[in-house]
From Swiss-Prot:
GO terms for biological process: cell wall organization; peptidoglycan biosynthetic process; regulation of cell shape. Residues 98-291 form the ATP-grasp domain. ATP binds at residues 124-177. Its EC number is 6.3.2.4. This is D-alanine--D-alanine ligase. SUPFAM superfamilies: Glutathione synthetase ATP-binding domain-like, PreATP-grasp domain. It comes from Ruthia magnifica subsp. Calyptogena magnifica.
Amino acid sequence: MIAVLMGGNSAERAVSLKSGEAVYQALINQNINCFEFDWHGYNLSELWQQEFDQAFIVLHGRGGEDGYIQKQLENRCIRYTGSDSNASHNGIDKARTKIIWKQHNLTLAPSIVASIHKPIEPIDFPLPWMVKPTLEGSSIGISKVDSQIQLNNALMLAWQYNSHALIEQWIEGDEYTVAILGDKALPVVKIITDQGFYDYESKYHSNKIQYLCPCGLSSSQEQVLQVIALKAFFAINAKGWGRVDFIINQHNKPYLLEINTVPGMTSHSLVPMAAKAMGMSFNKLVVAIINEI
């Protein structure tokens, strides 16, 4: 019996519910015994009353993607999809992820962490900047800062979600994402947005976003991204499945942006799109993720 864990109380709850419902329907379509569990982010006593031996985690953001739910399942020897508690803890924190990636000599935009509790250190890289909460996904709470005067408002927005924000040099270029399944990188997807950057509204509510798969890169360029994505994925000890986001500047230099250890599985989501490009249906993708447990 598989428990499909969705919901949570993070800022990504609505997305998680959509992802969870899609995964649940895929399992039902294949006559796989399962049930939905909408966790509201508090105690798990109702979950432990159910009989199940595996969990498909589609809890996005804090509580589901930060190692908490993974640790609870580990303590009960219940197998689950995706990365373990330690890798999840590393992956959700953008600042921690960057430290690990730097140790592996991966290419990143310059950045600093700004805490609500202390003065901001001098920023020694040029404008514009991207400001984002360190512990949120789906581009929630992010802002582009074009002048010093805009920084305070951007930080106040990011600090609504947690007490630390990442101030990162803005890299002008094209956005790409690489889905990973097991030890393989899936076809690269290019993201074209009219918003200036790929924010929450673009991801889940806009019909003006274009996704290209094939992505338009040469086979050698695509392979470079896939190799870097796998290095980034395994650097934080991620496993099972995930997604790594990039931007390529005007000099064709790729920069890592972030990693998602529990990516979206909605109709707009990019992992299903990449899987489809290699001939894998949504139903088969769901089973493939389970098989990586």
